[in-house]
């Protein structure tokens, strides 16, 4: 780290002493005001709330932080709250797609560094947002892994291969399922008034249990092959507030709905939708 800073000093990109510490304080203030306790000064309440919720979900539930330096760099240069929301939307898309695509930490650093390079080169904040998914600097064009964001079929393939996996719940140490469910839940809010906080303990629950009792209705209605195929898929997962209840997790359908979902869904939009749908289709054929 010392060697890296010495390079920055020697080529004039940083100055030692008070100037350096002022720069640190400036970035610290941006980090606090736009990431830790985000405030967005724009008239559009829904858009401002979207930034607050999305930045919170990313900071708390993405298991990496390489997306943060580009956001700090963008705001430090342009100080535009309105466009910062648009920037974060695209930044989150990039972070999620490349996480699904299996980028390593080194590959993420290289990928997000390209955005910082673009910010350094551009004096137009809208230009940065328009080009941030496709930009590669001339010297880096042949270096590092790149996803072509202009090819819809490439993006759809990444999404399909990830979201439809039968072991989806277990991906990335079980972190991806929680993040994707929270993102889907966020999109179900109108964000005009009360906004989701997602500050309590968030649990991912299986509707069809992972380990149903041999004499349960789950075993009667789903053979082993079907259970293996569906139990860890995205469509079998819902969000709950609070810690897991291992006993309730294996209850039969009606009791599970009453004891588990109906008491713990209040902070989420999608869980009651799943509950209502399942109650409406509670038959031998559809359950």
Tell me the role of every PLM-derived stretch.
Residues 133-271:
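Betabetaalpha-Me/HNH-type nuclease active-site subdomain
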Residues 1-178:
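A cross-family structural signal marking well-folded subdomains
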């Amino acid at each position: 780290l010392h060697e890296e800073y010495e390079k920055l000093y020697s080529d004039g990109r940083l100055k030692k002493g008070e100037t350096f510490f002022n720069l640190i304080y400036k970035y610290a203030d941006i980090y606090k005001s736009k990431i830790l306790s985000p405030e967005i000064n724009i008239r559009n309440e829904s858009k401002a709330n979207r930034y607050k919720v999305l930045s919170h979900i990313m900071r708390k539930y993405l298991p990496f932080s390489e997306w943060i330096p580009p956001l700090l760099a963008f705001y430090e240069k342009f100080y535009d709250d309105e466009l910062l929301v648009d920037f974060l939307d695209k930044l989150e898309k990039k972070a999620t797609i490349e996480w699904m695509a299996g980028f390593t930490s080194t590959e993420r650093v290289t990928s997000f560094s390209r955005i910082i390079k673009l910010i350094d080169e551009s004096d137009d904040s809208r230009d940065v947002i328009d080009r941030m998914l496709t930009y590669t600097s001339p010297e880096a064009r042949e270096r590092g892994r790149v996803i072509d964001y202009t090819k819809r079929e490439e993006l759809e393939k990444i999404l399909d291969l990830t979201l439809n996996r039968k072991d989806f719940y277990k991906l990335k140490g079980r972190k991806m399922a929680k993040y994707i469910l929270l993102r889907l839940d966020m999109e179900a809010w109108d964000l005009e008034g009360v906004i989701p906080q997602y500050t309590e303990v968030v649990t991912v629950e299986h509707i069809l249990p992972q380990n149903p009792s041999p004499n349960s209705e789950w075993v009667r209605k789903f053979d082993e092959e079907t259970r293996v195929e569906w139990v860890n898929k995205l469509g079998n997962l819902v969000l709950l507030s609070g810690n897991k209840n291992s006993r309730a997790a294996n209850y039969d359908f009606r009791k599970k709905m009453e004891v588990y979902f109906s008491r713990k869904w209040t902070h989420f939009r999608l869980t009651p939708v799943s509950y209502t749908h399942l109650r409406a289709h509670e038959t031998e054929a559809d359950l």
